[in-house]
Amino acid sequence: MNKDNTLYCSAYRIAFFSEIGIGISANSCLLLFHTFMFIRGHRPRLTDLPIGLVALIHLVMLLLAAYITEDFFMSSGGWDDITCKLFIFLHRFFRSLSVCDTCMLSVFQAIILCPQSSHLAKFKLNSPHHLSCFFIFMSIFYTSISSHILIAAIATQNLTSVNLIYITKSCSFLPMSSSMQRTFSTLLAFRNVFLIGLMGLSTCYMATLLCRHKTRSQQLQNSKLSPKATPEQRAIWTILMLMSFFLIISTFDSILTYSRTIFQGNQSLYCVQIPVAHGYAAFSPLLVLNNEKRLTSLMISMYDRIVRLESLCS
């Protein structure tokens, strides 16, 4: 039985850290791409800043997750209460930034696409300012609901204690009373329903506008659209796929979070939730890079420069 547990832990550890490695590499590439585009003086799209910001947030979040989860498999030792509170709260904080920035990206894209006759059109001129304030407010609100971590997270002193909810081998959560458990469950449900609902509405709105635009174009041309999509259409489809992927992951993660709240201390649910919770951060940049045609142009331009430098040196 111990041998089976060891094999299971080894396989799970390899799978999880493979996901983390893919996510760190992909987010680094996406962040470097946007940095190079800015340095080269290319005209940025309105969605470039939120996408670059979410890549940076995901990069830091995955690094924190790797450090915390390593303690899940093998105790790092030397973790006191302050260390536990700091790392777990920082991880939750960057997760909140990820969710809020993704929500902002979805709403921002919907405002950009809305026609002049829409009520959302009045936000177009001031949308960056308004959305920045919305991002800050939602990040504070999202993080404040998880502020109980600063009290509940403690260093694990006794591995045999049945009163603690184990997070890693060095950190645990103090159990909550039934009233506090119901309160936080309600707040978590409200938070997730609000943000996921807002992203769902903006995603459906963008999909409706895209289908309407496609139908009108077909009617004007009296034929099917060219199979080659325009940069605007590719950008819209990228955001739509990104939002759809996020909504699926968030819904699944919310179900697991609620289940863990009900069945406190269930390690199996925790093992399932860890890779699910980081799935969006790990694989979303691959989706963006795959649909980013400017990346090909940048690579060709860099290759031409390298060839020219080599020819000059020779």
Predicted feature residues:
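Transmembrane helical core of 7TM receptor-like proteins
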Residues: M1-S314
